[in-house]
Amino acid sequence: MVYSRRGSLGSRLLLLWLLLAYWKAGSGQLHYSIPEEAKHGTFVGRIAQDLGLELAELVPRLFRVASKGRGDLLEVNLQNGILFVNSRIDREELCRRRAECSIHLEVIVDRPLQVFHVEVAVKDINDNPPRFSRQEQRLFILESRMPDSRFPLEGASDLDIGANAQLRYRLNPNEYFDLDVKTNEEETNFLELVLRKSLDREETQEHRLLVIATDGGKPELTGTVQLLINVLDANDNAPEFDKSIYNVRLLENAPSGTLVIKLNASDADEGINKEIVYFFSNLVLDDVKSKFIINSNTGEIKVNGELDYEDYNSYEINIDAMDKSTFPLSGHCKVVVKLLDVNDNTPEMAITTLFLPVKEDAPLSTVIALISVSDRDSGANGQVTCSLMPHVPFKLVSTFKNYYSLVLDSALDRESVSVYELVVTARDGGSPSLWATASVSVEVADVNDNAPAFAQPQYTVFVKENNPPGCHIFTVSARDADAQENALVSYSLVERRVGERPLSSYVSVHAESGKVYALQPLDHEEVELLQFQVSARDAGVPPLGSNVTLQVFVLDENDNAPALLVPRVGGTGGAVSELVPRSVGAGHVVAKVRAVDPDSGYNAWLSYELQPAPGSARIPFRVGLYTGEISTTRSLDETEAPRHRLLVLVKDHGEPPLTATATVLVSLVESGQAPKASSRASAGAVGPEAALVDVNVYLIIAICAVSSLLVLTLLLYTALRCSAQPTEAVCTRGKPTLLCSSAVGSWSYSQQRRQRVCSGEAPPKTDLMAFSPSLPQGPTSTDNPRQPNPDWRYSASLRAGMHSSVHLEEAGILRAGPGGPDQQWPTVSSATPEPEAGEVSPPVGAGVNSNSWTFKYGPGNPKQSGPGELPDKFIIPGSPAIISIRQEPTNSQIDKSDFITFGKKEETKKKKKKKKGNKTQEKKEKGNSTTDNSDQ
């Protein structure tokens, strides 16, 4: 049983202790007390220790004290955590005569944020002596007054409170008067002078007394007042009031002129001694006289000034009623006016901001400001509630009575709203309710949460080649939605290699302006497309960035003159010699001039003109405008000059056009002497090379065999490669592809030349395309224009490749096999029939998108081809020039070269004779025919 009682008692004590600890933790408030008038540095309390804070945490956690009203009274030493008096504290000045006087402090520490409330009670000391309103009080007393008559006196006042304000009075010893002290309901002392002995005016007309007031403090303080008593003669009945004390309740907002009370005094005398006048006693303070007025005849007291419950909630008015006798008698009463509070004071707010500006990434519940509210009214009129304007990312949290915290309620975004103008409304509980507003400007500080953004992900720039070094080609601009250094954007190149050189050797970008400069002259023949990225990065911490792609297309200019493809044959002064039989007719192809231009478009479109020699007669030759074929204009006869010097001018279509000149020496020989003369000319011109003529047949057969094998290999490789997954375009550097197309097929060849499209970093690749020839389906196929092949894509490396068929023959690539698909190209042909074997018409939009040209046959020279024959034309992509190879019917007597240039030609073909039983002769004739075709 004993154990059970002890356990129950222990449980109750533990529960009581837990409740007490919970109450203390919930209140979070410390209480100290200090006496007023304490000196500077007076110890108040170890506030850091009492709050559970370490001394080393005070400075790092930004320990600070905020107080309402004067903030310099108390201070905290951050070294030892002691709260001490910083300046003089006068309780009477701070709290007037309120019973409780306290200084409220707010202790704030960060990391994490904590707010503690500290209340320092100011204890009263006896530092104010009792004081009378006047140094001398005058009384008029009739000599006829009976002993025990009482006369009210003005008491002293003490600004202190409690025991220090409890006053005791005494009167200096005399034989006529005593001092009586009474206490009313409000514990206020009333002094009355009591007559103990009848007065005799004839003996003494005036009495001087000294009233001494002593307070209850230690040490005691005193105050004195001099009483001057004048003894009046005979009026034995004084006016009397119904009550000695009148209590009146009055609204504090009563207007001026409002009746407070009407007093009535009576006098038992007759005549003039009965007539009474009313007036304020000399005991009434001037402040009270300014608030009220009394009618001396009627005794009505009215409001004369503005009343305020918050200043004084009650007034004591001493009224004297005196008759009009020569020796007047007076009666006395007191009117106590108690004011009733009305809701006439709006709430007041004090806002202490803590963290401004607020970072836009601040966590939720971050305390922005502390708000304290007050209302001078009392009761429900003084109960204040706060509210915040709606639709803002903040809220008010009530911490203690009349204290609120402004905290972050939702995420901030400075780019949406940079400043919040908050309106806090404080409203009291009166009826009608009064309210007040206060504005809090909350600035949102920027954090680097936005990367620079370009207007578009890719820009296309066109730059002419041969630009001056350092020229400005483009300006990139990125916008950052952040502010200040977070929006300061700098630009840089995303470095990589363009072929074998770094990107920075081609272009540079200004870090601040974003201007892109070309560091060196660009060459369209070397680089057609320069693709790179520019990075924009802000100055935030950490920095954010983004990239934009620039495609710089290098536009071609006519900076390359046509280059002649001259075979290595003998001649005088670099001229080419040709032997032509006199028996040839009109249209016989004598030779073909070939030239290439590294430019593209119109700049690479070549035309040929025959320049007449000075002083020479009209020559029987002409040159194809776009083919470069030199042919006869008429039949030659014996009257023609034996030697002709032809000047062929090769000109492109650029602005301005560039030219080159080729010289061809044409010698006319007899028909029977043409092969021999040619052999002798070759032997005399090239010397040891004449011995190779006999082996031409075997050499051509070997070349054809090897070329056929190579073509089959390339076809197989192309088929395998086309079946693979296509890859993105990269920066290529290799041999551009030349496509040669005809009715029997298309061929391709490559020539070593730098041609790059700079859009990546992959190693250079060689574009090599081969197509199998196909036979025409019918005679009408030559008259119908061919439609573009949708499967063909124009490679960038093909556009500048323009080379002669001689190189094709030397490389052994120009071959065709039967049965292949016919490669078709977009063509623009002249609608006007030409008497010449082949002409071309300029393309529509040449130099822009047209890079292929087709040869058109006139009606007089229909296109005829058979299986195994060489094509009649081929196209050089990237150039308007079409190398045309004209084929004549098999029974034609005119020897027209198909793929020969500047070579030696035989006068006529050998006629084939059919002889039965002589197979050896038939094979010999076929061998000679093959030799003729290979020479051509």
From Swiss-Prot:
GO cellular component, one term: plasma membrane
Record membrane topology: Single-pass type I membrane protein
Topology, Cytoplasmic side: 718-936
One function term, GO molecular function aspect: calcium ion binding
Region feature (Disordered): 759-793, 816-936
Spans through the membrane: 697-717
Superkingdom of origin: Eukaryota
Keywords: Calcium, Cell adhesion, Cell membrane, Glycoprotein, Membrane, Repeat, Signal, Transmembrane, Transmembrane helix
InterPro entries referenced in this protein's UniProt entry, alphabetically: Cadherin-like_dom (IPR002126), Cadherin-like_sf (IPR015919), Cadherin_CBD (IPR031904), Cadherin_CS (IPR020894), Cadherin_N (IPR013164), Protocadherin/Cadherin-CA (IPR050174)
Biased composition (Basic and acidic residues): 895-909
Signal sequence range: 1-28
Composition skew (Polar residues), residue ranges: 774-786
5 X 4 AA repeats of P-X-X-P, as annotated region: 773-890
Main location as per UniProt: membrane
PANTHER family: CADHERIN-87A, PROTOCADHERIN ALPHA-5
Protein name: Protocadherin alpha-5
Gene encoding the protein: PCDHA5
